[in-house]
Regions:
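Structural recognition of the beta-strand scaffold that forms the well-ordered cores
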Residues: 33, 66, 91-94, 144-148
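Contiguous mixed-secondary-structure segments that line small-molecule binding/active-site clefts
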Residues: 54, 85, 95-172
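Extracytoplasmic small-molecule ligand-binding "clamshell" domains
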Residues: 66-84, 118
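Extracytoplasmic "Venus flytrap"
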Residues: 33-50, 71-75
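Immediate post-signal peptide segment of exported/extracytoplasmic ligand-binding proteins
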Residues: 20-37, 57-65, 139, 162-170
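Short, polar/charged alpha-helical segment
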Residues: 42-67, 129
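Alpha-to-beta junction loops
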Residues: 62-64, 80-97
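N-terminal secretory signal peptides and thylakoid transit peptides that target proteins
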Residues: 1-14
Length: 172
């Protein structure tokens, strides 16, 4: 084999190798906006969305960027689901029971007073078809849900009147 043949074959191999290079290098960066129902100072909850966005960026070598926006920056805190439904933002970080007024079933997608504890909720979501059932429900609202954390059993209760004394008869 002469030198010209080697150079020609190496050139062909180089062109072929370039042609089969991963398409990921040619893809444009995807940029999504995440509207949160939570303010920045609530770092235990709001911060979870920031950590999520950072991890997605790291796992995609920066090709999928999520900008996280606190409550009120892009829309009202309790309007983030409407924002996703209308296409104003691509993602929301919220708690389903905030949307109880749309449908009472929104309440069971998160901790509720006297409801499941964190282990029970995780077991139901991942082993008891809870995620599947919730997404069947959310599909009616043009939504897809991914559990994004678990704060445990609801801290406190939901009452019609402000509690000012230890007298529980007035709230029962």
């Amino acid at each position: 084999m002469d030198r010209r043949s080697i150079i020609k074959n190496a050139g062909i191999a180089g062109v072929l190798a370039a042609g089969i290079a991963p398409a990921v290098h040619a893809q444009a960066t995807i940029r999504w906006r995440l509207a949160s129902s939570f303010p920045k100072p609530l770092d235990t909850i709001y911060g979870a969305a920031e950590v999520f966005a950072k991890k997605v960026s790291e796992m995609t070598a920066g090709k999928f960027q999520i900008s996280v926006h606190a409550a009120g920056e892009l829309m009202p805190a309790f309007g983030v689901v409407d924002g996703v439904q209308q296409g104003s933002v691509e993602m929301a970080h919220t708690v389903p029971y905030y949307y109880f007024g749309k449908n009472e079933a929104f309440a069971i997608g998160a901790a509720i007073p006297f409801g499941m504890n964190s282990r029970q909720m995780s077991a139901w979501m991942y082993e008891g078809n809870g995620r599947k059932l919730m997404n069947e429900f959310y599909a009616k609202y043009n939504l897809v849900s991914f559990p994004g954390g678990n704060t445990g059993t609801q801290m406190g209760g939901w009452f019609r009147k402000e509690i000012k004394t230890v007298d529980r008869k007035s709230v029962v």
